[in-house]
UniProtKB/Swiss-Prot annotation:
Catalytic-site annotation from UniProt: T2
Domain of life: Bacteria
Chief localisation class: cytoplasm
Native source species: Actinobacillus pleuropneumoniae serotype 5b (strain L20)
Gene Ontology molecular functions: metal ion binding; threonine-type endopeptidase activity
SUPFAM superfamilies to which the protein is assigned, alphabetical: N-terminal nucleophile aminohydrolases (Ntn hydrolases)
Summary of the function given for this chain in its UniProt record: Protease subunit of a proteasome-like degradation complex believed to be a general protein degrading machinery.
Name of this protein: ATP-dependent protease subunit HslV
């Protein structure tokens, strides 16, 4: 379980995630890096779900990005098609948020590709807490950047969700 949150504000997109990995009801590691840059540092991804499955999906998405020269939507749709048709991929239990400087998407565990209506996406066990916090911060008048809103949302989610911690990695594009 985890918390991954993505926020768009003032032409910037930031994705952040906590670092906790659990096995059943035990914390196995607190410094997992679930948010990573790829494709010439122009795309950022964040993963939730089974760690092994998330790594498989990350690698597949990175191959699609290379094949489609960094085109985010095309790469995500092609990955979703493969996810739905490839028998071995259908059992993967992971989802991811992918973003570049102008767009961000949720690629769900069932192979759906969702472009958000709002400027926030969140996944994982703490995702709803982080999304609510980020939306509240976006709707109030403040000078917080996308990266700062992600940091605050992750702190709040980490305080509430027992499967998320306060060891955060945040990337901005």
């Amino acid at each position: 379980m985890t918390t991954i949150v993505c926020v768009r504000k003032d032409g910037k997109v930031a994705i952040g995630g906590d670092g906790q990995a659990t096995l059943g009801n035990c914390v196995e590691k607190g410094t997992v890096r679930k948010v990573r840059r790829m494709y010439k540092d122009k795309v950022v991804t964040g993963f939730a779900g089974s760690t092994a499955d998330a790594f498989i999906l990350r690698d597949l998405f990175e191959k699609k990005l290379e094949l489609h020269q960094g085109h985010l939507i095309k790469s995500a749709v092609e990955l979703a098609k493969e996810w739905r048709t490839e028998r071995s991929l259908r059992k993967l239990e992971a989802m991811m948020i992918v973003a570049n400087e102008s767009e961000f998407l949720l690629v769900s565990g069932s192979g759906d590709v969702i472009e958000p209506e709002q400027d926030v996406l969140a996944i994982g066990s703490g995702g709803n807490y982080a999304k609510a916090a980020a939306l509240a911060l976006l709707r109030t008048e403040n000078n917080l950047s996308a990266k700062e809103i992600v940091a605050e949302a992750l702190k709040i989610a980490g305080d509430i969700d027992i499967y998320s911690n306060h060891n955060h990695v945040i990337e901005e594009v």
